[in-house]
Amino acid sequence: MGYGQYERHTRRRCNNTSLTVTIIALVVCLVLALTGFALSLTGAKRAAQELNDKNAQQEARISELEKQLEQSDVNALKEEIERLQKELEKANADKEALQEQINELNRRLEAKQQQNGELAKKKLIALTFDDGPGSRTTPELLDFLKEHNVKATFFVIGINAKKHKDILSRMAAEGHVVGNHSDQHKNLKNLGSVEEIKKAVSECNEIIKEATGEYPVLLRPPGGSTNALVKQACKEMGMSIILWRVDTLDWKSRDKDKILEVAFDKNSPYSIRDGAIVLMHDIYPTTVAAAKEMILRLESEGYTFVTVPQLLQARGGMEPGNVYHYAFPS
């Protein structure tokens, strides 16, 4: 082989070798590229799967929350139904209780009307006692009234009533009526307004309510002094003004015999008669003694002892703000 041929042969071999190397390099690059792509694809698939799993978890959570919300709405509705059911049951119970109260009041009204009709035909007398209660005299008087089944009306002063609430409670418990004689026995006519008059009797009203369970419906102004303002104040407070027909002047004489003499003076138009309201004061021992004899005499003369409201209801009724001295038979 000549040198030229050898050189050409050598160049071809080199070229072939270079081509082979190039091809191998390309193959290696391709393999690496495919491997990287495969890895990337695997990573992408894995990421996609993770995303799908996460989405599935979120969808499951959303579904669970929707179920909880739906159940929550159901529970809320159930609770509301139960609440309304309880309210309905209570309303029905209240209605039944109210109806029973109405029935009871109707029975009492019928009984009162019948009693008033019967009382109206009898000789009636209403004994009233002012300025108490006295710590010793009033309980003694109450003992006698209870013994003889006599009902009376007591007009108490606030400053005294406050000290003897137990006596007021006893009065009410034994069927007597407790009325207001002002807080401090001041002349109500000297007060300049309806509000001042109300203020002058309001504390006594509260004391009576606390002791007896009921607000008084009767006011006896100190000294019997009244005017348009006093009447208006009483009307607004739902109270009737109770004066008297028979003034025994027991506060002045302090003498049992003179008290009885004034009360039964046949020559006086202001002595005891059917329908009269009698004024006395239960803070004096002489008054208590006179009241005992008076009751015995009136019993013998056929009188029925009534409270002021009983007297007025039997003989025409009473209205807030009106003034009453007596209730004579028509």
Regions found by a protein language model. Give the residues of each.
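Alpha-helical scaffold elements lining the catalytic groove of polysaccharide deacetylases
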Residues: 186-214, 225-274, 287-293
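Hydrophobic membrane-insertion alpha-helices, especially the h-region
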Residues: 22-37
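N-terminal Lys/Arg-rich, disordered targeting/topogenic segments
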Residues: 1-17
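Active-site beta->alpha N-cap acidic-glycine motif
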Residues: 104-192, 196, 200-209, 297, ...
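Structural recognition of the beta-strand scaffold that forms the well-ordered cores
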Residues: 125-129, 152-156, 177-180, 217-221, ...
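Active-site beta-loop-alpha junctions enriched in small/polar residues
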Residues: 132, 157-159, 183, 222-224, ...
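Long, heptad-repeat coiled-coil alpha-helices used as oligomerization/scaffolding rods
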Residues: 37, 44, 48-51, 55-58, ...
